[in-house]
Amino acid sequence: MKTARKSILVMGLVMTAMLMIANPLLAEDKKAPMKLVSVKADTAITLDAMAEKAWDKATALEVKLDQLPYEPNNGYNGIRETTVKIKSLYDDKYVYFYLQYADPTQSLERFPWIKQADGSWKQSKKKDSTGHDNTYYEDKLGMYWEINKVKGFKKKGCAVSCHLTEEGLNNGIADTSAGRKYTNKPGETIDMWHWKSVRTGPLGMFDDQFVDDVTDPKANKNWGRHGDVKTGGGYKNNFNADKTGPAFMNSPYSEKDKYWVLPELKAKFVDTFKAGDVVPGIVITPFTGHRGDIKVQSAWKDGQWTLEVKRALATTGDKAEIQDVQFSDMAKTYYFGISVFDNSQINHVYHEGSIGMTFK
């Protein structure tokens, strides 16, 4: 009898292992969330994309990103795998993050205008069949936080609200995009921290957004994805009334800012340029209001991006409770995910599962 029981047990274990190999989702369900510990800072943190001594106190979590949501039909030259090293500190008012990841190229050429030999202007674009660009765009990073209880987030992380379009349909609606973001039922919201190296990075901020259950493109063109409440600022495509050239430029010209128009340099476009010259494709202005809650300093050097991030532990004001994760309970575990966009509009590398952050 004992031998028979042992045989049955062994067979059961073998079959379970075979099922997990055949069905990765089953294996993933057994995977526990990764863990990040935010440690109390002893000294003030200065946002400068450099690790001052205070960061020595925090232990880095390494998160491997090796999943892609889709293959663009016109090619993809971006990274297919990278590892994000992340640390966290906090003080009485703020939570901080220090992130580093390898990216061999600094991608800033987001839809720039190029002067042609015949005197006309052409905006560089190479969109794929989904209407998105993977050639003339920008580097980005996303942090995706569960605000309230989102079913499946702890196990699946970001993937629980990323819905791919299949056979031209998304949630029964005709759609050409590769996928859409939305939660699966009313009341579920996710805080989306989106760093954009061209549109927000030069201004020292993330684009603070959130995701809810909206699936009607008539109600919101970006489906469940929304910007937080703002009182001003933002970014806007730089083209004239008939879209044949830029409307604004930097004056004086700035090589450092050649791919974006800054508020303090913004001037009406005057064409004194020669063939091959570049004018930015985007005009950027700092967000005011909750959409600008997250501060950052970023730097690319020797094939690596470094971001030093700061946000209030708790936010207040209009709709803060449904648009922002609130780090108000130091005994709670906060679940999130990370993704990296290498010169891509929506294509990105991400990880399976979630990360659980606790405070110590």
Question: At which residue positions do the language-model features occur?
Answer:
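Beta-strand elements of well-folded, non-transmembrane domains
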Residues: 90-92, 101-105, 302, 313-315, ...
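Acidic, glycine-rich flexible loop segments
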Residues: 279-307, 311-323
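Short, well-ordered beta-strand segments enriched in hydrophobic/aromatic residues
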Residues: 49, 94-101, 305-311
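Acidic/polar low-complexity flexible segments
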Residues: 28-50, 55, 113-274, 301, ...
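Bacterial N-terminal signal peptides that target proteins for export
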Residues: 1-12
